[in-house]
A protein has these predicted regions:
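Structural alpha/beta core scaffold segments of enzyme domains
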Residues: 1-426
Length: 426
């Protein structure tokens, strides 16, 4: 599965699509997370990424074609083996049958794989669906109820050590000096050193790492962001809202309607930076060797994780393995892989398998936050109270800029506005 399961049910939803066209029994469906490789990229996103509630929308057509193509190849395999016209065969619930002959998909699949992929296949009519649009048991329910599901925080590897990071009290600050003399007296502590985001504390136990961090004395450089507060931020965004922006969508002539309407509602809203509050704080396990790298992480962005590992280790992509665990919530936060970068730096320096842990306090203090924004809304109503014109202006940081995808209009900033489902003429 090229999408991350973070409680939204994507393992179940996408499997339903394939299993329906394939005519495969639901109780035999098993899902394995896909490795980070180009072949698993979501073509519509240009990345192996889960986010924006796009998984079913982006994958629906492809997965239906995949399931139907697999069934067609299995039928062709049976047709050749039994020397029976394909039209006379029946594929149902994981078996192909004809007269007194019957074979499972698995028995036919090895030979089917050697056949050319069909260029055209028949997709089911909605009336033929056996899973799509119907209720089925979730694939992940049983192992989660039984406590067998493995999240990022649950992974344990042989001889792994633990690490936590002391990060700056405000964004933009860097380590100026470190006094780790008291920290090094802590039992089980292995090492203390500086990484790009702060000071890493490594120990044989979680307790040792946390106690070691408590004993650190770190001096930080100054940062332009040090004096920022809610009042200054709010005024900054309100000022930005008054400046000219770029137009993401325009229908009709809203300015003219709003100017001449008798019933108009106008409001300005401020939304603060928000903590994502995933149930599972950031955690990952990384093992950097000279000739290979292994990452176990609850990430939404496998492509970015792979690229980060490649950048830190200098290894080619085929020497890097990324295993995606279950995510204890994501909400977009785990598409940022800076916590994986930290673990990569620590493992490379320490030359050991490292489990990096964020406490809840770390996660709140040093997370990536949903962006603050200011919004100006004006709406015109007709005599029946229907919205006939809408003006919606937003001042918000450009998400795609840091993601390396600059554009004139940041689609993430106007998602839900630009493509709204309400029919408003202006």
């Amino acid at each position: 599965m090229n999408k991350s399961e973070m409680g939204q049910g994507v393992y179940t939803g996408l499997s339903m699509i394939v299993a329906d066209e394939l005519d495969f029994p639901w109780d035999r469906v098993i899902v394995k997370p896909a490795p980070a490789r180009d072949v698993y990229i979501d073509k519509k996103m240009g990345s192996q990424l889960t986010g924006g509630s796009t998984s079913v929308r982006n994958m629906y057509e492809f997965l239906r074609l995949l399931g139907a193509s697999m069934k067609e190849m299995i039928l062709e395999s049976a047709s050749r083996e039994w020397k029976v016209p394909k039209e006379k065969l029946q594929a149902r619930m994981g078996y192909v049958s004809y007269a007194n002959k019957k074979a499972s998909y698995g028995e036919l699949w090895e030979k089917a794989l050697k056949l050319p992929i069909p260029t055209q296949v028949r997709l089911k009519e909605p009336s033929e669906f056996i899973y799509i649009g119907k209720g089925v048991p979730r694939i992940d329910t049983k192992e989660k109820v039984e406590g067998k599901a493995i999240f990022g925080i649950d992974v344990r590897l042989k001889d792994m050590v633990y690490a936590v990071v002391e990060r700056p009290p405000y964004f933009g600050a860097k380590v100026k000096s470190v006094d780790d003399s008291q920290a090094r007296q802590i039992k089980d502590l292995l090492d203390v050193f500086t990484i790009s985001s702060g000071v890493a504390v490594c120990a044989k136990t979680v307790e040792g790492a946390l106690k070691g961090r408590e004993k650190l004395k770190v001096e930080w450089t100054k940062s332009p962001l040090e004096g920022f507060d809610d009042e200054r931020l709010s005024q900054y965004y309100l000022d930005m809202l008054k400046k000219k922006g770029v137009v993401a969508r325009k229908d009709g002539n809203p300015a003219l309607v709003l100017e001449n309407t008798k019933r108009k509602i106008s409001a300005v809203y401020l939304l603060p930076y928000l903590y994502h509050a995933t149930m599972e704080p950031m955690a990952c396990i990384v093992d950097v060797k000279e000739d290979r790298c292994t990452v176990y992480a609850p990430v939404q962005a496998q492509t970015w994780t792979l690229q980060t590992a490649k950048s830190i280790t200098g290894l080619p992509e085929d020497k890097i393995e990324v295993y995606t665990t279950y995510l204890g919530g994501g909400f977009g936060r785990k598409s940022n892989v800076e916590f994986v970068k930290e673990a990569l730096e620590i493992s490379k320096k320490l030359k050991k398998t490292v489990k990096l842990i964020y406490t809840r306090e770390d996660d709140v203090k040093s997370g990536w936050y949903r962006p603050m924004n200011a919004t100006h809304l004006e709406g015109a109503l007709d005599e029946k109270g229907r919205v006939v014109a809408l003006y919606h202006k937003i001042a918000v940081p450009a998400v795609f800029e840091w993601a390396g995808r600059p554009s004139r209009v940041d689609r993430a900033a106007v998602e839900g506005i630009e493509n709204m489902f309400y029919e408003i003429p202006h």
